[in-house]
């Protein structure tokens, strides 16, 4: 069954943030079909980014086994490679929600005729925990958006809403405040690891991270180790993934601010 990380990201996944109502309609097809349709429409062009459980991607792979050769690249935020988990002692959240799906996806890419450079890039906890957002980063982001704001602080009352003038910066600050508070309450400091944004950044530029080829399998039957990403670094078997092992954290935040700041300024009606 589907589980939501509400203790960290709030009941709707956006912390304290509230999005304006949308006039967009739900599509007449599901997410698995969307993967397949897009891949067929743009063969060899698209970069897939998976930042949650891999259920829909596994279903897409069942419908179209050639998906690994139809995509230009795949980046997955998930797993923990020679590192502790965040759901159990050894399992990461996204993989733990549907480990069977993760196993299918890795097996599908491993069995496909994919050159090593196009193997999935896996951004696990050992990588994403090196990229932690702080209130200073949010202040820099507001400045890049030409938005006045009040810096977030661990001394603020829980749930304090953003004072930013820019609407997008308000959404980001309200979402991040919940995340920062959750980490602070867990004893991790007033910071928040940027798991999913890092995967998106890697999709844009894989050179942001150093990778190492490996063969990854998902433990499905262990009483204590279910959903563990079992990683064989020996090189004796064909690799099915490129594991992110290091990242330039400063470069990530510079790029994040350089892209999101001006976009927020445009959304807010600025220059």
Which residues make up each language-model segment?
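Glycine-rich nucleotide/cofactor/substrate-binding loop typically near the N-terminus or early
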Residues: 1-40
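A glycine- and small-aliphatic-rich helix-loop capping segment at beta-alpha/alpha-beta transitions
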Residues: 8-12, 62-69, 93-94
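Flexible, glycine/proline-enriched loop segments at strand-loop-helix junctions
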Residues: 17-26, 44-51, 86-96
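A glycine-rich beta-strand to alpha-helix segment
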Residues: 40-62, 71
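Divalent metal-coordination and catalytic microenvironments
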Residues: 52, 105, 200
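Class I SAM-dependent methyltransferase SAM-binding "motif I" and its flanking Rossmann-like core
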Residues: 60, 66-88
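Short, conserved loop/helix-junction motifs that constitute active-site signature segments
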Residues: 65-72, 108-116
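Conformational coupling and interaction surfaces
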Residues: 96-100, 114-271
């Amino acid at each position: 069954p589907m589980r939501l990380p509400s203790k960290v990201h709030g009941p709707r996944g956006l912390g304290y943030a509230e999005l304006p109502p949308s006039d967009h309609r739900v599509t007449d097809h599901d997410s698995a079909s969307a993967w397949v349709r897009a891949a067929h429409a743009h063969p060899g062009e698209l970069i897939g980014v998976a930042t949650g459980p891999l259920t829909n991607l596994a279903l897409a792979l069942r419908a179209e086994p050639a998906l690994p050769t139809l995509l230009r690249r795949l980046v997955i935020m998930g797993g923990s490679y020679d590192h502790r988990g965040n759901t159990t002692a050894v399992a990461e959240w996204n993989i733990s929600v549907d480990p069977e799906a993760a196993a299918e996806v890795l097996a599908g890419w491993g069995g496909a005729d994919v050159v090593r450079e196009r193997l999935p890039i896996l951004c696990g906890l050992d990588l994403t925990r090196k990229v932690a957002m702080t209130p200073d980063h949010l202040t820099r982001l507001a400045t890049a958006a030409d938005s006045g704001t009040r810096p977030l602080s661990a001394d603020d009352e829980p749930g304090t809403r953003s004072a930013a003038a820019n609407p997008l910066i308000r959404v980001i600050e309200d979402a991040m405040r919940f995340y920062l508070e959750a980490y602070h309450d867990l004893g991790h400091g007033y910071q928040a690891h940027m798991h999913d944004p890092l995967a998106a950044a890697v999709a844009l530029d894989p050179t942001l991270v150093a990778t190492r080829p490996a063969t990854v399998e998902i433990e499905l039957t262990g009483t204590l180790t279910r959903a563990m990403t079992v990683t064989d670094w020996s090189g004796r078997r064909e690799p099915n993934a490129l594991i992110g092992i290091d990242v330039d954290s400063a470069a990530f935040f510079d790029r994040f601010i350089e892209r999101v700041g001006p976009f927020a300024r445009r959304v807010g009606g600025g220059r």
